[in-house]
Amino acid sequence: MEVSQDGSERDKTPPPSSSSSSSSPIPVVTNFWKEFDLEKEKSLLDEQGLRIAENQENSQKNRRKLAESTRDFKKASPENKLSMFNSLLKGYQEEVDNITKRAKFGENAFLNIYQKLYEAPDPFPALASIAEQDRKLSEVESENRKMKVELEEFRTEATHLKNQQATIRRLEERNRQLEQQMEEKIKEVVEIKQRNLAEENQKTMELLKDREQALQDQLRQAKDSVSTMQKLHELAQNQLFELRAQSDEETAGKQSEVSLLMDEVERAQTRLLTLEREKGHLRSQLQTANEDTDNKKSDNIDSNSMLENSLTAKEKIISELNMEIHNVETALANERESHVAEIKKLNSLLNKKDTIIEEMKKELQERPSAKLVDDLRKKVKILQAVGYNSIEAEDWDAATTGEEMSKMESLLLDKNRKMEHEVTQLKVQLSEKASLLEKAEAKGEELTAKVNEQQRLIQKLEDDILKGYGSKERKGALFDEWEFSEAGVAEQSEPMDQKHVPSEQDQSSMLKVICSQRDRFRARLRETEEEIRRLKEKIGFLTDELEKTKADNVKLYGKIRYVQDYNHDKVVSRGSKKYVEDLESGFSSDVESKYKKIYEDDINPFAAFSKKEREQRIKDLGIRDRITLSSGRFLLGNKYARTFAFFYTIGLHVLVFTCLYRMSAYSYLSHGAEETLMTEATTNLPHGL
């Protein structure tokens, strides 16, 4: 997001002025990136990245070990926990130290690159100022051409109208005014662009400060997130065991509470039934009392009122008990729902933990075995021997022994001979290309010198012509003024025409000479530009060829290094030391040091490791798959095998088709004979009857 904002702000800011190219941005940008040495910083960043990846892998391994040790510590008995606590605490302390070292290394790497890039100037203003300067220059050149055209028109008018001195003065005044206006416009544009450049620099400084603050905040947040993740991991482990214990306790408590609530509900129901029975009994007594005597109404009013009061009181008690039962049932339902929700949560947590445990088990199962690790170690040692020459002779003997070693020796010797032949051919080609490049560079320098000389002569000739033309104009103007002041307008027309006829003829002849010379110079300039273009294309082609040959030489140097290391370990003991010395003498010290540096910079251990991994996958295949793969490679890689397989398949198809044809013919003949016999039998049968 920050990069896009920077780009949008760049697009919104106006381009710098033409004078800014002569000020600080362009030389500052060029000096900074020249001193920055980007290739060196890339190599340092690659090393730091590899180290960071290695530290991450080591930390993951240590964390797994600590997790296993903590798991063992929790499973251990209390007597063994005291003895295991010190080692576990020491492991955690070592892991904390390693994490702090990782953090310090990452912070130092970030601060180093940040300190170097903090003072980096933005190349956009310089490039924009150059583009704006080119645009302004093209505009000024177009205006200059227009002014030259106008000046030429004015001069032609002046040659035809020499008597109109007022017109000439007016045009000259207009020219001066236009020049002054142009200078003022240029000054205004320069001032505006300088102000815009200052504002843009201020904005870029503010943006850089904001970006620095944002990066610091991000770093702080990353540190806080790392610490919180560690704490959350520890809390999650503690909460898992606590939740299991709490779930067991809560299930037991909930069951006891449910049983108590059920007992209370049963007691309330029994009490409700007794009260309802009493209510019915009292109602029956009241009805019997009303039916027995009407005379005793006055006497029984008090008893009825008492009975009604007791009945209402009992009804209130019954309603209260019903409300209590309803409340107890709702509370019981809520408790059941909460208990079910908690059980679901606990089950989900347990399922998550079980899935995590299953993933950890799968990851442990996918880990390589001890045998595979030993094989990989051997391969890494062989890779070190091939790439870095950092293995001892004993390890090399253990890695490659017996018949495989003899086969490898023969193959390496054959490759060594081929590479020597290729190296000699490439040296010859390189010398030829270098000589051609030197010739082309010399020719290009000669042509550039010739072009510069011709440009200098053209400039000198134009200056001389302008000087001569200006002096003639000044002399003619003075003479015209003097003649005009001495004589009348009518009298001076004839001598003026007579005097200016030869001057106009001289000017026309001089213009013809200048035009012809200009055409010749233009033709020569076109020829030189075309030749320079061809030479540039040739130089580009030669540089590409030189880069290709350099890359081929680096590859050959790597192969020769491999052969030298192998011969140094094995072949020297068998009496081929002289051969190795002859091989080493093929390179001079300077060339060897140069290609050694390029080769060491371009070493990529991951390519060799991927090759070893591919070979390991091929070894892990079944016998049938390996036989199929090797036979396919053999058939596709050998010319004679391909031709043999082609003709073999054709012959096999021809044989199969001939066999099928003969079998079909035999079957047809046999069926035909049986049919003839059957027909003869049928014809002879009635005669026999």
Curated annotation (Swiss-Prot):
Keywords, comma-separated and alphabetical: Acetylation, Coiled coil, Golgi apparatus, Membrane, Transmembrane, Transmembrane helix, Transport
Localisation: Golgi apparatus membrane
Domain of life from the UniProt record: Eukaryota
Composition bias type Basic and acidic residues, residue spans: 65-76
GO cellular component: endosome; Golgi apparatus; Golgi membrane; trans-Golgi network
Coiled-coil stretches: 79-367, 410-467, 514-556
Topology of the protein relative to the lipid bilayer: Single-pass type IV membrane protein
Alphabetized Pfam families for the sequence: CASP_C (PF08172), CUX1_N (PF25398)
Entry-annotated residues carrying N-acetylmethionine: M1
BP GO terms, sorted: intra-Golgi vesicle-mediated transport
InterPro entries, A to Z: CASP_C
Main location: Golgi
Stretches the record annotates as Disordered: 1-27, 49-76, 278-307
Residues on Cytoplasmic side: 1-643
Key word Ribosomal protein present: no
Lumenal topological intervals: 662-689
Transmembrane intervals: 644-661
Outcome (variant: Y648L): No effect on subcellular location when expressed in tobacco cells; retained in the endoplasmic reticulum when expressed in mammalian cells
Family: Belongs to the CASP family.
Function: May be involved in intra-Golgi transport.
PANTHER family hit by this protein: CCAAT DISPLACEMENT PROTEIN-RELATED, HOMEOBOX PROTEIN CUT
Protein name: Protein CASP
Lineage, top ranks: Eukaryota, Viridiplantae, Streptophyta, Embryophyta, Tracheophyta
